[in-house]
Amino acid sequence: MTKIENDRYLRALLRQPVDRTPVWLMRQAGRYLPEYRQLRAEAGDFMTLCQTPELACEVTLQPLRRFELDAAILFSDILTIPDAMGLGLTFGAGEGPKFAKTIQHQRDVDALPLPDPEGELRYVMDAVRTIKKALAQQVPLIGFSGSPWTLATYMVEGGSSKQFSRIKQMMYREPKLLHGLLSKLAASVTQYLNAQIAAGADAVMIFDTWGGVLSHQDYQEFSLQYMTAIVQGIHRQYDGRTIPVTLFTKGGGQWLEAIAASGCDAIGIDWTTDISAARARVGHKVALQGNMDPAVLQGDDAVVTAKVQEILQQYGNGSGHVFNLGHGITPDIEPARVKTFVDAVHRFSAPYHQS
């Protein structure tokens, strides 16, 4: 296989030397881009974009045409697995995701199939193959999945939640039932990510969006142990390639040492965690990804540039940092601010990498 032209992102994840800090954005393909909004309108709905490999490829490539990003990320959704398990995922206009069926009883868990990545989820693998070909080895392609805990919250609650009352009720009343669901999801996520790697993904990321709503003990028991099992099951060497794995728990700053012990290569951190302190705590074991508040992009160019410089300075000299936002970019951001952000990372990071 020919070498990726710009492998800065992969090298940073493995804490190898780079010439400047790599940068990409969570949700870099999305509603803040007018070309995305146009394509989504033409497609009719969000799931059509996800389930049509050519459209998913086009959306994935859109931000790379505008900005000098160091990685592409598969355009998909974390809820593809529960949808393939038969829960009936829909996205209403202006609404979040909703499931027609929810998981409430043991029989519901027992009835869940393990989706075939090249069967019910073939559209995702076809998208990976299509994108990988279109990228022509210019930058790496990131594959991803939701964490078992985060997927379970949607499957039990039936959609997005603020209180997480149903799943927490299950956690405290029927922990065995919840563990059964999480075990099944961990097996499915492992299979799903390995299939993405086989289809061409160069790195994978697990999004634990809702891990931060758990107590210290519950996080270890109901979220981290299942992500750790997935990390252990992922093909880290495939077809002559080393596949780095990033774990991201939003609101997970207190658990960095425990996350680093999972065996992952990198940890995503949000803006509530000090990146300098995070590096001091776990930088000898893992790379760090983050961690600018997406709201900074509401500021003008001077504000964005100053914040980029501040975070670079906080991280300090050497490799092991992938610059990103602390969560996904929001739809109200002007693309011009993103260009300022990306260009500032490249412009001001080089001095931190001079040996």
From Swiss-Prot:
Reactions listed under catalytic activity: uroporphyrinogen III + 4 H(+) = coproporphyrinogen III + 4 CO2
Any one annotated GO CC term: cytosol
Cell location: Cytoplasm
EC number of the protein: 4.1.1.37
Feature type site, description Transition state stabilizer: D77
Predominant place of localization: cytoplasm
Superkingdom field: Bacteria
Family designation: Belongs to the uroporphyrinogen decarboxylase family.
Function: Catalyzes the decarboxylation of four acetate groups of uroporphyrinogen-III to yield coproporphyrinogen-III.
Name used for this protein in its record: Uroporphyrinogen decarboxylase
Organism: Tolumonas auensis (strain DSM 9187 / NBRC 110442 / TA 4)
